[in-house]
Amino acid sequence: MLHLLVGLGNPGKEYELTRHNVGFMIIDAIMHHFLFPDFKKKHNALISSGSIRSHKVILAKPYTFMNNSGTPISSIVKLYKIPLDNIIVFHDETDIDFCTIRIKKGGGNAGHNGLKSIDTLLGRDYWRIRFGIGHPSNGYDLSYHVLSQFNNLNAVNNTISNIIEHISLLFENDKSIFKNKVKDLIKYTDISS
């Protein structure tokens, strides 16, 4: 069965390593760790196909900027006939503590424009991995916060490594096992921002 792993972010050098691009960072790390071929631009996204422990996987990074992420994802889903239950979207989340991971299926988009775009074209019945980037301090502009770089990139990379270590659990029916494994590993990692 084919799975689609999507990382949300904005294309361009100026957005690399920003909080809003943590989805792209996760997909890049998965690609390198599991030796996927280089990304090719198709359907307005960067795409690579390979496998993760015998599971066929397409990795995708929409290249339409965050607010229009749904258009390329919808094209990929329709072309490859991927069921919504086999779609996992990695994205930043300001309402979650820094480097905390939450997984859920469906639900609201909490004002995240990338998710809003996907919801509009595909509905909400897909999986989301929410990567906590923390909320800005009082008086700090939210858009500046999400578009600025991480203060503690080591903690981000450690959390991404924890995700990769247990990613094959995402292809199982009970995704809470993945959540618990990653959460337990994060407890023992220095994640102060």
UniProtKB/Swiss-Prot annotation:
InterPro entries reported for this sequence: Pept_tRNA_hydro, Pept_tRNA_hydro_CS, Pept_tRNA_hydro_sf
A molecular function GO annotation: peptidyl-tRNA hydrolase activity
Any one GO biological process: protein quality control for misfolded or incompletely synthesized proteins
Record-listed tRNA binding positions: Y15, F65, N67, N113
Endoplasmic reticulum listed as a keyword: no
Function, in words: Hydrolyzes ribosome-free peptidyl-tRNAs (with 1 or more amino acids incorporated), which drop off the ribosome during protein synthesis, or as a result of ribosome stalling. Catalyzes the release of premature peptidyl moieties from peptidyl-tRNA molecules trapped in stalled 50S ribosomal subunits, and thus maintains levels of free tRNAs and 50S ribosomes.
Entry similarity comment: Belongs to the PTH family.
UniProt name for this protein: Peptidyl-tRNA hydrolase
